């Protein structure tokens, strides 16, 4: 992976080419991981519904899983080799051993371990090659404990989804994103892409995430419950139990019977609470006013409060005059009635004035940055124009002063008497 040092425009071309290759490798790795998971699900369902009848086909499916796993491991190594080459290009290195750190080696080994876990392609000890069960009373016709754990561990390959989404999003390949991100010290990682899609397509992201979690956890729960030949192990029951647990309803008509099933339901409830919080945040943001709507609403409320203040002030003056009038006439009953109305009008006027003041403070605090930028730009242009005009006037004054100096010099030379000529003796 070493070689000559590439700088300048060649380094940019090399970086773009490496990112394109990483994108293709990550895409194919995700395809192979999905293929392996699909074959694993097919093997488990065939074993559940058909038992030992199709033992040769089950062995063939296991061999295909092993083959896809081998290709996946090769792609994982190739991807990290491209990562090392990209690091060497960015930092101007020649020796790949300098770019390969211990942390990266540990990450590569961990990924190889996670992606390499799969059911071993061996026939079940409970089945013969003829497709008959050796001990029909002891074997329930499903995966053993070790094989079930290896099968479920293949779901850990889904960690490749964020990597493929990051490379497919175009953020790393966009020069504008990289330039602005470098100026603002923003790292374009998986969380940035998740926030990006959460802001641009929140409905699609939450729907896909929710459906994916439902289907995955429902199948995992069915596998866990089938180990004990429980009635909850049917996929239809788990497809009902998982959404009810996800939505934190819990009718109690279907319950898990195994320890692993209870753990899956607990994790499903926690994920449901998190997704519900995200959904509430998205809905609250969608129900908020945008800038134009907020300005219109504040403007109309300002007019409404100003009108109420005028009406309250007019009512206060009216009741004060009526109170003064009935006090002069010695009508104590009417005077007390109008005094109560006057105090109520004073209270209403103070309340409306307080609301109007709060609205003004809220409007003043909502300073639009773009508007402020435009105001500053206009102010800068005005100052520049004034400065240029002042410089022109100063230049004009300087020219007039030079001309006046020349005129004064000429006038003084004309008024100076001629020097007497000395005659030769």
From Swiss-Prot:
**Can you name this protein?**
Intermediate conductance calcium-activated potassium channel protein 4
The record, for InterPro entries, names:
CaM-bd_dom (IPR004178), CaM-bd_dom_sf (IPR036122), K_chnl_Ca-activ_SK (IPR015449), K_chnl_dom (IPR013099)
Subcellular location as annotated: Cell membrane; Cell projection, Ruffle membrane
Q: Which reaction does it catalyse?
A: K(+)(in) = K(+)(out)
One GO CC term, this protein? basolateral plasma membrane
Where would you say this protein principally sits, based on its record?
membrane
Q: Does the keyword Ion transport apply?
A: yes
Q: What organism does the UniProt record list as the source? A: Rattus norvegicus
Q: Where is this region: Calmodulin-binding?
A: 284-345
Function noted in UniProt:
Intermediate conductance calcium-activated potassium channel that mediates the voltage-independent transmembrane transfer of potassium across the cell membrane through a constitutive interaction with calmodulin which binds the intracellular calcium allowing its opening. The current is characterized by a voltage-independent activation, an intracellular calcium concentration increase-dependent activation and a single-channel conductance of about 25 picosiemens.
UniProt-listed Gene3D superfamilies: 1.10.287.70
């Amino acid at each position: 992976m070493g070689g000559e040092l590439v700088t300048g425009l060649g380094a940019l071309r090399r970086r773009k080419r490496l990112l394109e290759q990483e994108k293709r490798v990550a895409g194919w790795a995700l395809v192979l991981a999905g293929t392996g998971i699909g074959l694993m699900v097919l093997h488990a369902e065939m074993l559940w519904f058909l038992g030992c009848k199709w033992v040769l086909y089950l062995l063939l499916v296991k061999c295909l899983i092993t083959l896809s796993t081998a290709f996946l491991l090769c792609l994982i190594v190739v991807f990290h080799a491209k990562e090392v080459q990209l690091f060497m290009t960015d930092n101007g290195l020649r020796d790949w051993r300098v770019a390969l750190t211990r942390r990266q080696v540990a990450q590569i080994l961990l990924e190889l371990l996670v992606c390499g876990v799969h059911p071993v392609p061996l026939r079940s000890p409970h089945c013969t090659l003829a497709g008959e069960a050796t001990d029909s009373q002891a074997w329930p016709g499903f995966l053993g404990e070790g094989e079930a754990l290896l099968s479920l561990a293949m779901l850990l390959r889904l960690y490749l989804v964020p990597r493929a989404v990051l490379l497919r999003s175009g953020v790393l390949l966009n020069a504008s994103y990289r330039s602005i991100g470098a100026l603002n010290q923003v790292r374009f990682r998986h969380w940035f892409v998740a926030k990006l899609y959460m802001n641009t397509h929140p409905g699609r992201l939450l729907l896909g995430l929710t459906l994916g979690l439902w289907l995955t956890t429902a199948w995992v729960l069915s596998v866990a419950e089938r180990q004990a030949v429980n009635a909850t192990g049917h996929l239809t029951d788990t497809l009902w139990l998982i959404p009810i647990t996800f939505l934190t309803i819990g009718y109690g008509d279907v319950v898990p019977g195994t320890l692993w099933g209870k753990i899956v339901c607990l994790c499903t409830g926690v994920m449901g609470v998190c997704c519900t919080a995200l959904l509430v945040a998205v809905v609250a943001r969608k129900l908020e006013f945008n800038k134009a709507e907020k300005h219109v609403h504040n403007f109309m409320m300002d007019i409404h409060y100003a009108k109420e203040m005028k009406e309250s002030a007019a009512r206060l003056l009216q009741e004060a005059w009526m109170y003064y009038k009935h006090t002069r006439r010695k009508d104590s009953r009417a005077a007390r009635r109008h005094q109560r109305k006057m105090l109520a009008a004073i209270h209403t006027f103070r309340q409306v004035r307080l609301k109007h003041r709060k609205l003004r403070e809220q409007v003043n605090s909502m300073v639009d940055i773009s508007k402020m930028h435009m105001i500053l730009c206009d102010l800068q242009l005005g100052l520049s124009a004034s400065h240029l005009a002042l410089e022109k006037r100063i230049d004009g004054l300087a020219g007039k002063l030079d001309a006046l100096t020349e005129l004064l010099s000429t006038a003084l030379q004309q008024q100076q008497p001629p020097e007497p000529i000395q005659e030769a003796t």
